[in-house]
Amino acid sequence: MTYSKIACSLGKRGIARAPNQASSFFLLLFLFAKFSQQLSPSPCLASSGVAKSRGPASTDRPCSASMAEAVLDLLADCSPTASVPVAANAPSCAGVAASAGAQGASPSSQVSPQA
């Protein structure tokens, strides 16, 4: 099981949900990665699956990327505010509201007057 899978599953189960617990959890994870890097100077992330889980952009990385980078990637993956790619042709919220108003589907036109 990779570091990202372990940390994400712990975060989803509520072990690392509270702010203080989450920061201490990731600090311990970072320190563990730092010390394991000192014990083994070039860990191969490709064999553990950490680099593969990030998609095609991560395959450009060399196999000897540091564990600290893996932890930082893990933090980016597991954060609730991680950016989600949006399709370039997806309509914006303002555009959808404007088109709904132009078609007479605005909330004010749908309200029937009370007698």
Swiss-Prot record:
| Key word tRNA-binding present | no
Q: Which domain of life is it from?
A: Eukaryota
The signal sequence is 1-38
Instruction: Write the record's keywords in alphabetical order, separated by commas.
Output: Signal
The keyword Secreted belongs to this UniProt entry's keyword annotation? no
* Swiss-Prot/TrEMBL induction comment: Expression is strongly induced under conditions of nitrogen starvation. Expression is positively regulated by the cluster-specific transcription factor rua1 that recognizes and binds to the specific 5'-T/G-G/T-C-G-C-A-T-A/T-C/T-C/T-G/A-3' upstream activating sequence found in all promoters of the UA biosynthesis genes.
Which pathway does the record list?
Answer: Secondary metabolite biosynthesis
Per the record, which residues fall in region Disordered? 42-62
Summary of the function given for this chain in its UniProt record: Part of the gene cluster that mediates the biosynthesis of the glycolipid biosurfactant ustilagic acid (UA). UA is a secreted cellobiose glycolipid that is toxic for many microorganisms and confers biocontrol activity to U.maydis. UA consists of 15,16-dihydroxypalmitic or 2,15,16-trihydroxypalmitic acid, which is O-glycosidically linked to cellobiose at its terminal hydroxyl group. In addition, the cellobiose moiety is acetylated and acylated with a short-chain hydroxy fatty acid.
Q: What is this protein called?
A: Ustilagic acid biosynthesis cluster protein orf3
Can you name the source organism? Mycosarcoma maydis
